Amino acid sequence: MDRLTAETKIKELAKRIERHNRLYHEEDRPEISDQEYDQLMRELRELETSFPDLQSPDSPSLRVGGEPLPFFEKVVHKTPMLSLGNAFNEEDIRDFDRRVRQAVGSQAVRYVAELKIDGLAVSLHYENGLFVRGATRGDGTTGEDITQNLKTIRSIPLRLTKPLTLEVRGEAYMSKGAFEKLNKEREERGEALFANPRNSAAGSLRQLDPKIAASRQLDTFIYGIGDLQGETVESHSEGLDLLETLGFMVNQERRVFDDVDELLAFIAGWTEKRPHLPYEIDGMVIKVDSYAQQEELGFTAKSPRWAIAYKFPAEEAVTILEGIEVSVGRTGNVTPTALLKPVSLAGTTVKRASLHNEDIIREKGLLIGDHVVVKKAGDIIPEIIAVLPERRTGNEVPFAMPTHCPECGSELVRLEEEVALRCINPMCPALIREGMIHFVSRTAMNIDGLGEKVVAQLYRDGIIHSVADLYYLHQQRDALLGLERMGEKSVDNLLAAIEASKENSLERVLFGLGIRLVGAKAARVLAEHFGNIDTIMQASEEEITQIDEIGPKMAASLVNYFAQPQAQAVIERLRAAGVNMEYKGIRIESGADLPFSGKTIVLTGTLTQMSRQEAEEAIARLGGKVTGSVSKKTDLVIAGEKAGSKLEKAEKLGVAVMDEAGFLQVLESNA
């Protein structure tokens, strides 16, 4: 390709990628899949590698991460990034209001209330509209230059919509979903787990290798202007509106108040609603809106007098650690779980808490009988965040992890660079049983009627020995009828569900096999790339690692799995039973008269008749696109049980809402 053609192609690709970034992050209506987006990015990087002088300073390719840095440079903040004073109750807020009104005299006062995102405070600098530097808050006066890591966050614009020179402040964070996904992947790899989303965001941005930050799903909300040239704004709310027009992500859950009682009611509402947010917040920030009044109020030595941070009551409780049990998962990981004296926390009774691995028990210094502090954030599994050694009586006893598998008796091992103990006996009953439970789960083969208890009973009674045996259960009808709560109709339904699962696309089979390190997304990438199971089985590590999303460890795991005669035998029995071994993808129906054609749809709450993945695929087949959050661009919200803030926002914006019954009726009418 000649230089002129390459220059044209690079500009075209950059424009397309930035458009899709905007559709995904700002408008919540993506038009292409992750795989299609990655392909565009690959094309751009290849061209820029061939013509490095054609790479622009705001190229989207800079988001994938450059070379590792030897250290972080120090950055002195032109305007200090001060911390805020705290308020812990209604009276603290009223005191703040009284102080403000007393200081400004007879002037009218308006406040802006915003969610306090639990992440890492960052400063972003732009010159003539281009992102040139980003830094951590540090001690408020001096931070660290993390520009290369921040460039990997897609919601941070590399070029603004106006050529302004300014500095903005915001919060980099990791959503609850991204945090749970990251920890699950780390657990499967035997790596140490992050304690919470905030720590994971901070840890990701302080990596010297930007590729690590790029691999983690970080996001930002910008909440203020530190310095601005060439534009005039007179209030904080006006400044937030400007930031949105420039291309920044600004949190939509903000309100302006001139009445403190209404402000307090708003705060109280979010105290109840915050568990339903997709990201963590630890309070609300209240700021005087007028910049003139902010200047008049000034600062103390530590914080501004015109702002305060309200901290939500901690969702924590003290209870007693009564014991620790260990279980063996499908990958062989031996996981300890804390058994707690039942305690009420965040509206539920907590009896168990995750401990993840032996290192966490040792780091926390846990003893059986200890008084411990338990925390629960949203839907995240409860965790022990602290031990209270001052309450020990002398009767507490240490816990020792087993040296042998509690299920099969094999010696446990700790593989290199892993923190988890692991059973590596492929014939371990726990590995086989848990592997089969995973295979039939909704995210894998999705076989209705085959829950954990049924699979465990089938395995315990010797009716099945591997996942392939599931597809021969029609030959053991009498044995099925002998199971607990299994009548003629239940058996018929179960066998029909097993038969239907044979038509699943390859990625579900691949994920269901439980190959170490291969999650649902990687399974889809592999299935889409290779097309069928035979091509994957014949692929070398080198061929597999050519795929951008697949690393050397996963490639080695795949090759090792398919080299095992036992795995080959299972796959051949599945094939012989008629299980599909080819990638089908999602079939999108054609035709403008489809019920969801061109519609942007948000799912919220729990659907009782299908999984979220099934619902998303059904919507896609009928022409719709599913996004994660509600905005003015949303056409329809489908609300299941316990729908939270998304439903409220839809009603506030006047977005159409459909319940599960209505959704099912649409699907049945278009079956």
From Swiss-Prot:
Obligatory cofactor(s): Mg(2+); Mn(2+)
Keywords: DNA damage, DNA repair, DNA replication, Ligase, Magnesium, Manganese, Metal-binding, NAD, Zinc
Binding locations of Zn(2+): C405, C408, C423, C428
Residues covered by the BRCT domain: 591-671
GO annotations of cellular component type: cytosol
Gene Ontology terms, MF aspect: DNA binding; DNA ligase (NAD+) activity; metal ion binding
Annotated protein name in UniProt: DNA ligase
Organism (species): Brevibacillus brevis (strain 47 / JCM 6285 / NBRC 100599)
Gene: ligA
